[in-house]
């Protein structure tokens, strides 16, 4: 039991110890990261962050060895500066070599890209400023000491209509100015230095002018080719003779007249006894047509035939005329019992 208690006490004591490798490297005697803000460093005789009688540094030491201090009164900052400098010194700043200038210097100097010289634009004064707004319109103008000028005036009748100008002096010493108008035609600026669009090529300009003349003359060009061979290949196809939508008189077609829709020799078939009948077809008129014998029409033996035979016939039970074989002449006699006879 005593051994257990002794081991526990020893373990607690060792647990409080921080190994050296977790600490920053130990510096020379008289310099280093001391532990306290108010007490002297452990082994450096006045080293550390908080030596008595000084700022962050020890009593005469800091980051940079003897005679320096992080905020000391007479040492150089980081070991680089001479007498009279320091991070928060009285007469120096973060300049490394002492003297005026720095981020947080004391009595003299400030951080500036021009060595402390005041910028002319930052210290510009307003020389003139007028701003008038009434029910009829507005007007304003101003001018500054560094060469900036602007003015504008306008009315709010039938929309805002205004005009004005703007000018300033560039870094090259030249004056740049713009005048403008803003009304129903939009914003139109003018100025010698404004970029201008490139000229239109001559060929494109001629084409635009020709298009304008054609439109004025009522000529409309939709881009369709109308030269040699235009329209070729339109004839034929479904609308040719004998096609599905043949014209009047097309042999064997659906069209009106001739052999086809309107009757005549041939129909949907090839004549003779068959689906289309002999001399007749889908159309009306003629033998086998809409009133002819053996056609699909309303003639004798047709689909809606009022005579004998056919789908609508009263006397015959056959639906189609018998196939006579080969190509018939289309001029036979029709019998309701036996069909066509040639």
From Swiss-Prot:
Transmembrane segments: none annotated. Residues 332-342 have a biased composition (Polar residues). Residues 135-198 form the Chitin-binding type R&R domain. Residues 1-15 form the signal peptide. It comes from the Eukaryota. Component of the pupal abdominal endocuticle. May have important role in the larval and adult exoskeleton structure. This is Pupal cuticle protein 36. It comes from Manduca sexta (Tobacco hawkmoth).
